[in-house]
Amino acid sequence: MFRTKRSALVRRLWRSRAPGGEDEEEGVGGGGGGGGLRGEGATDGRAYGAGGGGAGRAGCCLGKAVRGAKGHHHPHPPSSGAGAAGGAEADLKALTHSVLKKLKERQLELLLQAVESRGGTRTACLLLPGRLDCRLGPGAPASAQPAQPPSSYSLPLLLCKVFRWPDLRHSSEVKRLCCCESYGKINPELVCCNPHHLSRLCELESPPPPYSRYPMDFLKPTADCPDAVPSSDETGGTNYLAPGGLSDSQLLLEPGDRSHWCVVAYWEEKTRVGRLYCVQEPSLDIFYDLPQGNGFCLGQLNSDNKSQLVQKVRSKIGCGIQLTREVDGVWVYNRSSYPIFIKSATLDNPDSRTLLVHKVFPGFSIKAFDYEKAYSLQRPNDHEFMQQPWTGFTVQISFVKGWGQCYTRQFISSCPCWLEVIFNSR
């Protein structure tokens, strides 16, 4: 009976693997954009699997790597390609089964719970020996065809490849979430192998592609900037300013105020919904509908907006995003099934006078804010910048819908549902 249950768990896990492989998924996320951060106008509202896997989805965030791979691609005849794909699938299945059968029943149950939840609920760490090496290819038990050199995966990487991102190749492409016990540990004896405790790393090309550019002058307040709106008691003395057009924000702090590290405002088009949300914990979940959710629930806010587009986008926010303050800056993890769009002064080339809007696919993380870079961008020796408040401590995030040159929405205030994250500069 014990063996029967374990075998059933293994079969159930294999049936829950991420759909598609590299060839099947190529170009899925590119839409009309090809392979970079350009031309997402046709795909801004497309849903993706909870894992956010697939070469196409990685392509828009890791465009340079994907283009390099395509440049060295040599097409195979259909029969040859199908045979190679079938062999790779068989190898991966054999390797995965051999690894899973080494796990205890309780470990298999924890892994299955994490995989079937698709990151919608907080699941426990799955701690396994970190030195276990999985080889796929010649020399490995799973391989019979010596056509290519063997691929070696750590156990966490293998499980991420099987259950989230079939095109995953290297550990440098993933980032461990701060909620994980293995976060920040180097070569531990036991490492967490929960595939939903890692995210796909969104790397930006250098220099950034010409997508959704904004003049840096828009960072400066305009002459018709309205008066400051008095803050509520929960903002810790934060005054909120909304310059015309872009609705950018500035954080004005009372001396000695260290009660929060950022403030979050939720907007529907040009209307702010609910109060400003002060963030004191290092991690915050922002979601609309999340099982066992703990954080900023947008679904509990009272909104009078009757727009069908707003209501449609609101229903797609789902698990939303995770905002975390870490040693190197502030990271945003897209937990939803749809892309998010981010604009931040610290994501761009400091010598550029333009800002970009960056598209982040489901399952990906991006370092949305860098404190050190933000301080350097203040240009303390620049007389013009010293005379006016600066908005570089603000990040704007739109759910599902993008804005900029590739869209009819030129400004984020035209987006149905979006966030403004205002960082404490002290």
UniProtKB/Swiss-Prot annotation:
SMART domains assigned: DWA (SM00523), DWB (SM00524)
Residues recorded with modification N6-acetyllysine: K64, K70
SUPFAM superfamilies: SMAD MH1 domain, SMAD/FHA domain
Protein name: Mothers against decapentaplegic homolog 7
Region named Important for interaction with SMURF2: 208-217
Cross-link (Glycyl lysine isopeptide (Lys-Gly) (interchain with G-Cter in ubiquitin)): K64, K70
Alphabetized PROSITE patterns for the sequence: MH1, MH2
Placement of sequence motif PY-motif: 208-211
Chief location category: nucleus
Gene name for this UniProt entry: Smad7
Phosphoserine found at: S249
Function: Antagonist of signaling by TGF-beta (transforming growth factor) type 1 receptor superfamily members; has been shown to inhibit TGF-beta (Transforming growth factor) and activin signaling by associating with their receptors thus preventing SMAD2 access. Functions as an adapter to recruit SMURF2 to the TGF-beta receptor complex. Also acts by recruiting the PPP1R15A-PP1 complex to TGFBR1, which promotes its dephosphorylation. Positively regulates PDPK1 kinase activity by stimulating its dissociation from the 14-3-3 protein YWHAQ which acts as a negative regulator.
Binding site for Zn(2+): C125, C180, C192, H197
MH1 domain boundaries: 64-207
Binding partners and assembly: Interacts with COPS5. Interacts with STAMBP. Interacts with NEDD4L. Interacts with RNF111, AXIN1 and AXIN2. Interacts with PPP1R15A. Interacts with ACVR1B, SMURF1, SMURF2 and TGFBR1; SMAD7 recruits SMURF1 and SMURF2 to the TGF-beta receptor and regulates its degradation. Interacts with WWP1. Interacts with PDPK1 (via PH domain). Interacts with TSC22D1/TSC-22; the interaction requires TGF-beta and the interaction is inhibited by TGFBR1.
Bias (Gly residues) ranges: 28-39
Source organism (scientific name): Rattus norvegicus
PANTHER family membership: MOTHERS AGAINST DECAPENTAPLEGIC HOMOLOG 7 (PTHR13703:SF44), SMAD (PTHR13703)
